[in-house]
């Protein structure tokens, strides 16, 4: 099982404000959906809570929610209290799927600190945003990269962005 991370960030690593996204980019949302479909998505409880009820669980993916709360339940998702336990559980599966870490900031930090992330898909949005949540600092010199997609701003996507894949 491969562990990947997927995130969209502003120029300064911004990823959110008030437990919500700070941009609307349908082309990037399509990339996220297409990339994570048929795989496992691991997210923190606040990230789960930020998804509108009508869109959760995320369709076509096995949803996993990490929380410190022992009595938390999430309809349509599996709940774990520990990232390593979740990864161990899915690693024992015979299916060859990827576990995508989809946020938020604390879960990204946990995964990066654990050293389990083998690949990252980062959407770099060419704009600065007012934010209260940021992607953890990463030493990109330790990673190889290639460009997956470049998208100019248009009537549906107000900001230009580039999706890069990083791997070790």
For the regions a protein language model found, what residue spans apply to each?
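Enzymes that bind and transform nitrogen-containing heteroaromatic metabolites
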Residues: 1-168
């Amino acid at each position: 099982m491969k562990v990947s991370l997927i995130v969209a960030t502003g120029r300064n690593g911004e990823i959110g404000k008030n437990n919500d996204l700070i941009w609307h980019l349908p082309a990037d949302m399509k990339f996220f959906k297409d990339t994570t479909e048929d795989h496992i998505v691991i997210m923190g409880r606040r990230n789960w809570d930020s998804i509108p009820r009508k869109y959760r669980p995320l369709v076509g993916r096995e949803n996993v929610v990490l929380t410190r709360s022992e009595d938390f339940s999430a309809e349509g998702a599996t709940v774990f209290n520990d990232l390593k336990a979740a990864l161990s559980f899915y690693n024992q599966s015979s299916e060859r799927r990827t576990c995508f870490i989809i946020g938020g900031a604390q879960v990204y930090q946990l995964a990066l600190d654990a050293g389990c992330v083998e690949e990252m898909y980062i959407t770099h949005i060419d704009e600065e945003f007012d934010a209260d949540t940021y992607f953890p600092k990463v030493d990109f010199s330790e990673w190889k990269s290639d460009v997956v997609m470049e998208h100019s701003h248009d009537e549906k996507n107000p900001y230009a962005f580039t999706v890069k894949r990083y791997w070790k």
